Each structure stands twice: as structure tokens, then as C-alpha cells.
Amino acid sequence: MRRLICKRICDYKSFDDEESVDGNRPSSAASAFKVPAPKTPGNPVNSARKPGSAGGPKAGGTSKEGGAGAVDEDDFIKAFTDVPSIQIYSSRELEETLNKIREILSDDKHDWDQRANALKKIRSLLVAGAAQYDCFFQHLRLLDGALKLSAKDLRSQVVREACITVAHLSTVLGNKFDHGAEAIVPTLFNLVPNSAKVMATSGCAAIRFIIRHTHVPRLIPLITSNCTSKSVPVRRRSFEFLDLLLQEWQTHSLERHAAVLVETIKKGIHDADAEARVEARKTYMGLRNHFPGEAETLYNSLEPSYQKSLQTYLKSSGSVASLPQSDRSSSSSQESLNRPFSSKWSTANPSAVAGRVSVGGSKASPLPGSLQRSRSDIDVNAAAGAKAHHAAGQAVRSGRLGAGALNPGSYASLEDTSDKMDGTASEDGRVRAKLSTPLVAVGNAKTDSRGRSRTKMVSQSQPGSRSGSPGRVLTTTALSTVSSGAQRILVNSASAQKRSKIPRSQGCSREASPSRLSVARSSRIPRPSVSQGCSREASRESSRDTSPVRSFQPLGPGYGMSQSSRLSSSVSAMRVLNTGSDVEEAVADALLLGDIRTKKKPARRRYESYGMHSDDDANSDASSACSERSYSSRNGSIPTYMRQTEDVAEVLNRCASSNWSERKEGLLGLQNLLKNQRTLSRVELKRLCEIFTRMFADPHGKVFSMFLETLVDFIQVHKDDLQDWLFVLLTQLLKKMGADLLGSVQAKVQKALDVTRESFPNDLQFNILMRFTVDQTQTPSLKVKVAILKYIETLAKQMDPGDFINSSETRLAVSRVITWTTEPKSSDVRKAAQSVLISLFELNTPEFTMLLGALPKTFQDGATKLLHNHLRNTGNGTQSSMGSPLTRPTPRSPANWSSPLTSPTNTSQNTLSPSAFDYDTENMNSEDIYSSLRGVTEAIQNFSFRSQEDMSEPLKRDPKKEDGDTVCSGPGMSDPRAGGDAPDSSQPALDNKASLLHSVPLHSSPRSRDYNPYNYSDSISPFNKSALKEAMFDDDADQFPDDLSLDHSDLVAELLKELSNHNERIEERKIALYELMKLTQEESFSVWDEHFKTILLLLLETLGDKEPTIRALALKVLKEILRHQPARFKNYAELTVMKTLEAHKDPHKEVVRSAEEAASVLATSISPEQCIKVLCPIIQTADYPINLAAIKMQTKVIERVSKETLNLLLPEIMPGLIQGYDNSESSVRKACVFCLVAVHAVIGDELKPHLSQLTGSKMKLLNLYIKRAQTGSAGADPTTDVSGQS
């Protein structure tokens, strides 16, 4: 069995070329399995990576340092000039090219190869000498944002080209690239830990080029700030960059930041990661060269152990680059650097370790006293990043460590009270941690100068590793199995396998393979507690990485921790072993064996949850082999977290952990607790609420998704105890509804909201929602607004009328909701706000009416109009059901009222406006019902229906058209309908196109409409309220004349509803546009007051329709409105001009012709000053044909301007015309000439000073046309005389 296991494990040697975490460390199989010859400082293989080189030493002599996909500085230098050659003929051409490049790079919607080519084009410009033009540096500043966006791109090729381009800019421009370098360096640092090697190495190489060529002191804080990054690879690289900076820069560039440099290097010398410490020691050399005094002060401030290690390093390295690559442990190594040296571990006393090394054979017995240190046991956490340390002196000649030197008592060291992190000095002066685990790793270990066993470098997957294969995490460690009857571990050195590197996942790795966390079904090993308060070693985590493997600590000093913590290293080792049950059983037996030998009892299993030994569906193979919910499903074993359902404190500690995998396991344990109905104490609840509050912002997707699942169970179990936390819960969930989440996560948030709504008192929820709505510290997004409003609406359906309280907070919230009905950016918000007002009105009509009465007049107008239309439609839709008592609707009682939103149509199933009357309507006739409605409406109509804006800008109206009623909608019954609406340009919600009535023939009778809760197409006339009331509720409607204004309002509402069907119902929309064109010629002021904004916005949106005839018709309608009501465009001039000019780009001639006609009318309709101010920037910046249309339009406008006004506007007009006169398009040049002629016609010879930039030939041509215009020889159409002239 032992041979079989060894063979299986060693089959995975192919992983020995896995790369380190930052994707840029050399490794090869050859160096991993051979004892290297002693190396001298001059040996190039032994020398550390040259800080300035991205490539570094080649692994195996063939591959680049970063491995497949990596790039180095040589690649960059080749790519600098490996670009298409172009020539620059003028600064203007250069500016145009740079503008196009910026446009492409600033928009990530362009194809990625276009963006990559644009980046290459920048290098082409540099090669062509763009840096010699002054305008280049101005445009380079504008390119900063585009370069940053490219460096953040998801396409590695775009990122690579961006990095090469930045490096080239730095190389060519030097310190002139200071602003760009300062902007791009933070983005480049973000590439360092990237899992794609091409991105990581490109970012590193670009930073090196910037450091070499752009010596700007402002870069120093950017680099030093990353020296304290939470990412280990970023810290390593930052110190490497700092070292390069200290080598390359002059002292005067560093003086301003000397203190920062000293502090950063000091932190680096104390860094938790070994390689970061090595790089920091290198930077000390550079610091000493620049600032010897500060360096001396820094040295004196270090603890003795750090001074010793630094001194040893300085002695052993003749230069910065000669440091041997020894002891490059991973960030998970545990060290006690503060512990003083012990004389027995001195390098001058090699006999102290004689018992560890086999000098003459393969089976030398260890000294009795050296049992605690005489094994080659490798702690997985400590050895995960250990580099092979090269032998020296006698240890070199000793060959490899005799594996047989281990006697059966080796496992006793697991319990040895002296097994602590003793400080030992290696040959580079570092203090090493002595750690032990219960796993025997037999490999090609090497020894240092004291005979200390060393292990090979461990390859680590990068953060965010793309591999999800279980095979990537299989170890090649040779593990000897322990038979059930044996009491010792037998190791045969003859068959000892070579130790390979152990691939290990880093923090954000996607690997959730069963092989990482497998625990045998029959294993009695509990999951170790890491974040327990009693286990202080958890706080000594020496890395800032949050890898799951690193969450378990080695044995601590004094052996004073609990059994579960003591076994953490063992379980940590198991997480990287294969999933075979024989391996796991061997580990379990080994652990029990260690306990027996030290006369300790086995660990007590504290966690025995339900189903521990069952094979139910929860542990079946139905789920993915890589599912994080069943790590060991392939073995049928129960995940360890299933056994932790009793220790609430540990579950909470895991939930609060900074390690995402622990948080996830804590949530799973909490789910089990809740499913077992395990209630939490008040203290536990308080702590869990604090943890959950933080988890709403958890950055890890898996944790957040599981948190939402756990939250639902938590609410259901503890809903009676969480009322104090309800505000946080509800507001955070609503905020999450506005976030960009995956559909599945969004559904979980919605489920949590539904459970919350069902679990807590309605009045408490309502008060919290009102409070949240008016909270001035909150600025909810549009999506959050919709979520809040929909929640209030749904809550109102299940509330009792008594739950609605007319408090000051509620009034403020309702006024806020009323303002949301006018939200210009989102129709969803407008619809939802209108629904909320209707729902609250139906919930408790008297109370809500009183609340409206207390609001300012402006808020009353919008709400009253909306509610009136709702009442009208509700009553209108129920007329068809009044004839039979069987179909007569019954209003909602206080206990079971239904919201109108639940019934899409007001037919026989529809409900009358609730709470207007609480008595039985079964015996009421239609007159009784309408008198009841009248009472409610009269209360609403006590408000003022005209805003101050209407009073200040009265328009002419025909009073005869303001009052009255519509045609009778049924025998003996009037249609409850209001009169025309007052103009209220401050109420854009009344223009909401999406909430208009569904298309119904205007003159159909009876007028039975589909119920639409958002309808507000009509409103109450402000001119004759008493007549209005009579019109609404008098049974004999024939006494009132037909109201044309009302008919027009209805028609417009229906037309707009039809026009909202973009890209659909083409023929119907054509008819609607023709009808709208007819309406533009009628003076229905109230209709236009109410609907103008909606009509305009819809027409402008229709200009983007896919049907050209619709686009052309929309422009024609716009032209007619401009002709008949130009004053209304005062506030929309810029938008209208822009959209009309953009239509000139249309590929269909019919649309372009309509756009030209509309632009011509537009030029004569809007005030000349306003029009010129809009057109001038367009003429200067727009491309053909928009600039042509703008120039023609400006020509027409200038004809309307007085001489004095034109003189004032001339500085704005002339630059665009002079620029256009030089345009490549002849038609643009012609238009500029005619525009200049028009200007001359107004101001005469005062134009000449502004023409100084024109060449002689252009002046000659202009004078010719000016003379023609003066003599009239050009005729009515001067364009006929300029063909070929320009």
C-alpha cells in the first residue's frame, strides 16, 4: 500500500513548473529535484533577480521567468518600434489623429483589436517624431483617462499594448511624462497580482520603465503606499521597484520623501513575507548610498534580531544583486523574528545538529536529546513557500538527509512542550521558525550550513486563479501510510521519493476542489478552531493573504492551546492531499498514535451534529465535484462544518473572520444551527447583527450569496428579537436591490425582502420606510427608489387602515414620493411613485386626504390630479358591472381590501375606490355610489389646483372650453370626468409617456376603459371648481356641452401611448403622427400645456427609430410645432437643435430632407442669440455633415440678428467659420463662405479685422461673393455660382 501511495503521489510531478503567486518567479523541475553545487556570489545563477529586469534568470535555460505568456523588458523594447510606420505632415493632422485615438480608447465598446491598434498608433506617432510638436503634450494630458481605461481592460492584449505604450512614452519623453506617469502608475500596480501572466508582467515592466526614465518625486508616495499593500506579490514588487528607484534616481529627487522612504524600508524589514523582507534589505543598501545618516538611524532603531539578520545579509552580499535566493519562504511562513539567538543554534556549532544529518549512511540514529528537532517533518504552512537552500561545508558532502533516521518516536514531538518557534539563524542572517507537523515528508531535502533540513520552493496559484480542476491541488508529497496495527512510521530511504513543490491556492482562488478539504468519513479529526478567542496563535498570522490553507496555525509556544488548535497543522496538511480514504486514515492513525505515545487522550469531538454518519442526500454526489458546499462529496464524507453546530461562539468567530472561506463555513454552520432551531442569546444576537451588518458589504460573491440564504433563516427564527435591527436590515436590503447583482443573487435579495415584509409588524416597517425615504443623508439611486416604492406599495396591500399614521414624517415622505412622480430620468420611478400614492390613498382615504391637505400647494397639485384620474377610471370601469347585483363590486373591507394594482382591468372583477365608504354597496344604486365618490373628491378639490408658475405665466384660454363634461358614457349615467387642465410646466410627471391611457377610439361610446393605475391624462380645471363638481357627479350629463379640450387631451394621451411603442406597430404610429400633426394647428392651449414636454421628448426619441418613414414624420411634426408654438422651445433649444442636426447624418434622403426643413424653421423660431450660442460649439467640434447643417442654420440665424448683437457675438462665431473655411469637405467650405457673406451683409467692413487668418486666395474668393451678394448677381440661390470655386 505504501508503494502504491508513493507512486500515485509522485505521478503529479508535472506540476513542478507551477508559477509563484505574482506570476514572475523562476522554477524548474531540474532545480527542484537535484542538489545544486555550491554557488559563489559571482555565479550568475545564484545571484538574485536583477531589479531592473523583468525576465530574470531563465528556468531550465529555456523558458522566460514568468512562464507561458509572460513578457519582459526585451519584449517591450522590441515592441516600441514594431509598429506601422506613419508620417506626420502638420500639427493639425497630429491633433486629429490623437483625437481619434482618444475617442477609440475612451469607449470600451469598440472592438478590442481597434483599441490595441490605437495604442500602437500612439507609438507610431512617437517614432514619427510627435514629441517635437507642442500640441502633442496637450493631447497627451487628455489621453491619461483613456490609457488608464486601457490598462484596466479585460483583454490581456489591450493591457499589454497599453503597458508597452506607457513605457515607450516614458522612455521617449522622460520627465515630461510626469503627469501621465502619476496617473497610470496606480493602475499598473493593480495588474501586479493579476492571474494572467501577460498582464502581471506587463504591468511590472511598465513600472520599471517609468522608474528608470521619469524621475518625478510624486511617484515615490505611489510606490511606498503599495509597500504596505494587503497583497503579498504587490508588496514584494513594490520593494523591488523601490530598490530600482534608489539605484536609478539622483539624491535631490529623493530628498523630499526621505522620511517616507526610511519608514517604508523599516516596515519592509519587518514584513511578514520572507521575499518582501529580502527585497527590503536590498533597498536598505540603496538608502544608505543616498542618505547614510538616515540609514544609520534606521539600523539603530531595529531590534537586535533584525539588526543581526540585516548585518549578516550585508556581509554575505558584496553588492545588492548578490544575495543568494535562500529561504524564500511563502507568505504563510511563521517566524518569531523578535526572539534572540540561542547559542546552541549558532552557525559556529555544527555539532549541535549532528543527530539530524546522516554523514556516512542512510540510517544514522539521532541523538536521544534531539528527538524534538530530528525529523524532516515539514509543516505545510511553513514549507509552502520555502526555497531550496544550498548546502555548505560538511553538509554538502553528506548527501541527502537519511530518512531512516526517524525512529518510531518521531511523532512524540507533536506533544513536546519545547516545540516552539525557536529562532535559528540561517546563513543569510535570517531567523527561522522551527515548526513541526504530524506528516512525514520524505524528499530530497537539503541542509544549510548547520545541517538544517530545507525544502523546495512551493508553487502557488495566483489570486483569482482560473483553474477549477481538482487535479491542480493534488500534492506530490510522498506520504508513508501507517497500518492499523503498527505503532510507528516506517520510512525506507531507498524508496524515498523526491519532494516536489506543493501547489497551493491563494486568497481568491476559484479552486473549491474536494481534494483541498477532504476529511475521511471514518476520521475522528475535528475541524480545528482558528478564530477562537482562546487560540492566540490565530492573531499571529504572518501574511496578509487570506488563503484558506493559511487559516490554520502551527503549534504554538508552550503547547497551551486546545486539542483542536493543536491539530490545525495536520488538517491543513490534509487539505492539500489526495482524497483517498487510505491517506486520510493514515493521518488519523498517526494523530492517535502521537496521543498514545505521549499518554494523552484523543481529542474530544465537540461537534456531533445530525447526520454525522449518514449518507443522506446532503452528501450525495449529485452536486459538482468542485462544489464548495460538499468538499468531500466524492468520498461520501461529511463536511467538517456539519460538526460545528453546537459551538455558537466559534461559528460567530468564523463569520467575523477576514478569511472569506472561513466566513463561508461560519455561515454554513450558522445555517445548521438555525435549521436545528438553536436560538441565540441576546449577546449572541447582538454580535451576529453586527457581523451581518458588515456582511451586507462583503466583497466576496460566494460569501454574500450564502449570507443572503442564511439571513432568511435567521429572520424566520429570530424575527421577534430583531425589531431593533429592522431599520438596518430593511434599508440595506433595499440598497442592495439597486446594486448591479447577478440575477440569482438579486432573487435572493428579493426573497429576503419578502420574508422581512411577512415577518415584522406592518406599522413598524411603514415607519422605517417613511424615515428612510426622507433621510437627508441618503441619496438613493433610481433603482433603489424603485425598490423602496415597490416595497411600500406591496406593504400597503397588507396593512390595516389603522397602521397608516398621519405624522410629520409620513407627510414629508409622501411629499418626497410626489416629487418622485416627476423624476425626469426614469419612467419606472414615476410609475412606482404614482402606484404608492394610489395605494396609500386606497389604504386609508380620509387620513390620506387630510395628509394631502397639510402639504404645500405644489405637492397638492400633482397628487390630486393623479388621484382624481384614478377615481375617475375606477368608477368608469365599474359601470359595466353595476347592472347586476351578482357582478357589482364590493369595496375592500379594513381586513381584506385589495389594491387596484392587483386587478389589471376595471371590469366585473374590479374594485371601487376603497375606503371612500366602508358600508355595504350591495344595496346602493349608481347615484349613491357617485355621491360617495363626490364626497371624497370634494375633500381633495379643496386644494388649490394652480401653481405659482401658472399664475405668473398665464396663457390665453377659451373659458368655454375649460368647463363642462364629456359625452354620456352610459344610459342614465355620466362619465365621471374632469375638465381641462391648467398649464403646469412644473409637473413633468403629468407628462409621463409610459403611464398614459391605453389606445381607445376617441369617440367610442360607452367609454369603458382598461384600468390603468398610472393614468393621469386629465386633471381638474382650476377655473370653475363648482361647475366641475356638477359636471362630475350630476346624473344628467347632457346639460353640459361637449368639451373639445377634453377630447383633445384624451386624443393626445392615446396618441402618445401609441408613439411609445418604439420600433413596433409602424402603421399605427404613422397614423398617430399624422393625427398629432393636425393637432398642432389647433389652439388647444391646455392640451399643449399638459403634454408638450412629453410630446417633444417622444418625438426626439422617435428620431432614433429603425423605420425611416417614422423618423421623417417625427421631424415634420416637430417642424409644425415649431411653426405654431415656438415659444415653448425656449427651455429645450439646445436639445432640439442637437437632435435635429444629428438627423442630418441619417442614411435616408427623406429623413435628411425633413431634418433640413426642421432646422430651417428652427433657425427662425428660437431667439437668435440663444441659437448662435448653441451652434458655435457644434460648428467647431462636430464632424461632417453635422457641422455643415449647423453652418447653414447659423447663416439663417445671422440674417435675423441686429448689427449691435452680431458685433457682440462675433468672437464666438468667427473661429468656427475660419476653421470650417479650411475643411476638407468642399460643401462645408462653401457654407462657411456664404455665412461670412451673411455676416458682412449685417456689419459691413467691421468684419475685416476678423479675417486676418485667411490666406490671400481665400480672401479673394470671399470678396468675390460679397460683391455678388451686394450687386445681386448671385441671384436667389448663390450656391449655383460657387461650384468648383473652393
Curated annotation (Swiss-Prot):
Localization, per the record, is: Cytoplasm, Cytoskeleton; Cytoplasm, Cytoskeleton, Microtubule organizing center, Centrosome; Chromosome, Centromere, Kinetochore; Cytoplasm, Cytoskeleton, Spindle
Could you tell me one molecular function GO term of this UniProt entry? microtubule binding
UniProt biased composition (Polar residues) = 341-350, 872-884, 893-914
- Renumbered to this chain, region (Required for cortical localization) spans 1009-1286
Q: Name positions with the PTM Phosphothreonine.
A: 779
Residues of the region (Interaction with RSN and localization to the Golgi and kinetochores) are 864-1286
Which stretch carries the motif SXIP motif 1? 500-503
Residues modified as Phosphoserine are: 14, 20, 322, 333, 336, 374, 376, 413, 461, 465, 469, 484, 495, 513, 531, 535, 570, 572, 581, 614, 620, 884, 944, 947, 1005, 1021
Gene Ontology biological process terms in this record: cell division; cell migration; cellular response to insulin stimulus; establishment of cell polarity; establishment of mitotic spindle localization; establishment or maintenance of cell polarity; exit from mitosis; fibroblast migration
Q: Where is the composition biased (Low complexity)?
A: 322-340, 459-473, 620-634
Region feature Interaction with microtubules, MAPRE1 and MAPRE3, mapped onto this chain: 450-565
Q: Which keywords describe this protein according to UniProt?
A: Cell cycle, Cell division, Cell membrane, Cell projection, Centromere, Chromosome, Cytoplasm, Cytoskeleton, Golgi apparatus, Kinetochore, Membrane, Microtubule, Mitosis, Phosphoprotein, Repeat
Matching InterPro entries? ARM-like (IPR011989), ARM-type_fold (IPR016024), CLASP_N_dom (IPR024395), TOG (IPR034085)
- Enumerate the residue ranges of region (TOG 1): 66-317
Which residue stretches belong to region Golgi localization?
1-40
Show the ranges annotated as biased composition (Gly residues).
Answer: 53-69
Region (TOG 2) spans which residues? Answer: 642-873
Q: Where is this region: Disordered?
A: 17-70, 320-350, 355-374, 410-473, 492-566, 606-638, 870-920, 944-990
Where does the motif SXIP motif 2 lie? 523-526
What note about domains is in the entry? The two SXIP sequence motifs mediate interaction with MAPRE1; this is necessary for targeting to the growing microtubule plus ends.
Sequence similarity:
Belongs to the CLASP family.
**Protein purpose:** Microtubule plus-end tracking protein that promotes the stabilization of dynamic microtubules. Involved in the nucleation of noncentrosomal microtubules originating from the trans-Golgi network (TGN). Required for the polarization of the cytoplasmic microtubule arrays in migrating cells towards the leading edge of the cell. May act at the cell cortex to enhance the frequency of rescue of depolymerizing microtubules by attaching their plus-ends to cortical platforms composed of ERC1 and PHLDB2.
Quaternary structure, from the entry: Interacts with microtubules. Interacts with MAPRE1; probably required for targeting to the growing microtubule plus ends. Interacts with CLIP2, ERC1, MAPRE3, PHLDB2 and RSN. The interaction with ERC1 may be mediated by PHLDB2. Interacts with GCC2; recruits CLASP2 to Golgi membranes. Interacts with MACF1. Interacts with SOGA1 and MTCL1.
Question: What is the designated name of this protein?
Answer: CLIP-associating protein 2
Q: What is the lineage of its organism?
A: Eukaryota, Metazoa, Chordata, Craniata, Vertebrata
Q: Which gene encodes it?
A: Clasp2
